[in-house]
Design a protein with these regions (language model features):
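A Zn2+-metalloprotease active-site environment signal
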Residues: 19-323
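Bacterial N-terminal signal peptides
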Residues: 5-15
Length: 323
C-alpha cells in the first residue's frame, strides 16, 4: 500500500449541511491518539534497525486550515484546540517526550522558539503540517528543543526513532500509504483492527515500506505508477515490496512490544472483508498467502526468542534486489 492519496480530506471536507449529523471528530481524534502511541512505539523501538532516523516527539499534528469555517468549531472542540489560526497537536503518545513535557491534544505549537513559524507552500491544506514535520525531523535527536507555544517556551527532549511521521486519513475507504518519510492510515483500514496490536500490524506494514526504502527502490527500478502498474514487471515489483513489508512487519511489532501474531489476525480479517474486490490486484499477494508469509516470520521470531537470541529479521541490512 505505497500510494499516497491525493485527497486525504474527502471524509472530513463534507458540506456544511452534513454537520447536522453527529460530529465525526471525536472518533477521529481517538483514532489519532491510538496511531500516535503505536507509531511512537514502533519507530523508537526499532530505531537500531533503521538506516534513516529522526527525532521522535510522540505527536500527530492538527491544523485549523484543514477545516471549513462551518467545520472548525466542532473540530477544535474535539481536539481541545483554541480558535486561532495556529497548528496544534492532534494527539500525543502516552509516555512520549511530548507527554513528559506536559503537552497534550489541543496544545498549540507554532514551531521553534525564537524562529518564524513555517507556513508551507501552495494551497494544500496540509502544507503547514508538512512544513512542521520536515522542520522537526531535521533537528538533532540528542539535544532538547525549545517549542514556541505562543506562551512560555516549552523544553522537550526527543528520542531517536525511524525516520517517519504519521497521519490519519478520515475516509472510510480501507487504505494505507507510505512515501518514504510519511505513513498514512485511513479510518476505513483501522476499523478491521479489533485492538491496538492489530492496528499496529497495519501501521507496521506501512512503516516497513519506509524502512526498506521501497519508494526509492521502485523509482530506481523505473516502475510505472499509472494504469500500467497492474501489469507485467511493474505489478511483479510492487508485489515484491508488499511481500517484503508483510515479512518485516511482525518483527517490528515484536520489537515494539506487540504480539506479532496479531498481524495474521488483522490481514485475515481484512482479506475476508465484505465487499472486497472479486479480482485480486496484481500488485498484492492473496490474503491467504500474506497470512502464511507472516505466520512463517512469527515462527522465526518465536524460535529466536526461545533460543535466547536477539531478534534479527532477515530483511534488515540485506533486502533482496528488485528484479
Amino acid at each position: 500500500m505505497l500510494r499516497l492519496s491525493a485527497a486525504l480530506l474527502l471524509a472530513i471536507a463534507a458540506p456544511a449541511a452534513a454537520m447536522a449529523e453527529p460530529s465525526p471528530y471525536p472518533a477521529l481524534a481517538a483514532l489519532e491518539a491510538r496511531v500516535a502511541t503505536i507509531g511512537y512505539r514502533l519507530t523508537t523501538g526499532n530505531a537500531p534497525w533503521c538506516a534513516r532516523v529522526q527525532p521522535q516527539f510522540g505527536w500527530l499534528w492538527g491544523d485549523p486550515r484543514l477545516y471549513s469555517d462551518a467545520q472548525r468549531p466542532a473540530a477544535e472542540a474535539a481536539y481541545g484546540a483554541a480558535d486561532t489560526d495556529t497548528p496544534f497537536l492532534a494527539a500525543v503518545a502516552a509516555g512520549s517526550p511530548a507527554a513528559v513535557a506536559g503537552l497534550h491534544a489541543g496544545s498549540l505549537v507554532q514551531g521553534l522558539a525564537g524562529s518564524l513559524p513555517p507556513q508551507g507552500e501552495g494551497s494544500d491544506p496540509y502544507a503547514r503540517i508538512a512544513a512542521l514535520e520536515r522542520l522537526f525531523a531535521g533537528l538533532p535527536s540528542d539535544r532538547p528543543t525549545m517549542l514556541d507555544t505562543g506562551k512560555a517556551p516549552v523544553r522537550i527532549a526527543p528520542v531517536v526513532g525511524c525516520a517517519t511521521d504519521f497521519r490519519v486519513d478520515a475516509r472510510d475507504r480501507p487504505d494505507g500509504a507510505a512515501d518514504g518519510r510519511l505513513v498514512v492510515i485511513s479510518a476505513g483500514l483501522a476499523q478491521f483492527a479489533k485492538d491496538d496490536a492489530e492496528l499496529a500490524a497495519a501501521i507496521a506494514h506501512e512503516l516497513a515500506h519506509n524502512i526498506l526504502g521501497h519508494r526509492a527502490r521502485l523509482d530506481a527500478a523505473g516502475v510505472d505508477r499509472g494504469l500500467l502498474q497492474q501489469f507485467g514487471r511493474n505489478a511483479r515489483l510492487f508485489k515484491q515490496t508488499e511481500i517484503e513489508a508483510d515479512r518485516l512487519s511482525p518483527w517490528l511489532m515484536a520489537n515494539a512490544g506487540y504480539d506479532p501474531r496479531a498481524a495474521v489476525r488483522f490481514w485475515t480479517a481484512f482479506g475476508q472483508r465484505a465487499g472486497r474486490p472479486l479480482l485480486q490486484a496484481g500488485t498484492h499477494p492473496r490474503w491467504q498467502d500474506r497470512a502464511a508469509s507472516i505466520e512463517k516470520e512469527v515462527r522465526a521470531i518465536e524460535a529466536q526468542r526461545a533460543a535466547g537470541q536477539p531478534l534479527a529479521p532477515p530483511l534488515i541490512g540485506a533486502p533482496p534486489p528488485l528484479e
